[in-house]
Curated annotation (Swiss-Prot):
This is Unknown protein from spot 19 of 2D-PAGE of thylakoid. Keywords: Chloroplast, Plastid, Thylakoid. It comes from Pisum sativum (Garden pea). One of its GO terms (cellular component) is chloroplast thylakoid. On the 2D-gel the determined pI of this protein is: 5.6, its MW is: 24.0 kDa. It is found in: Plastid, Chloroplast thylakoid. Its main location: plastid.
Amino acid sequence: VLNQYLTELYYQVEANNKSYASNNELAVFPDQR
């Protein structure tokens, strides 16, 4: 059960990161470029 919860949490974080990157393609990691 815990593994399933972590998998869902990881997937949700990945989806949020992709959405954020889509909205701010050039400003995701400005200090690392």
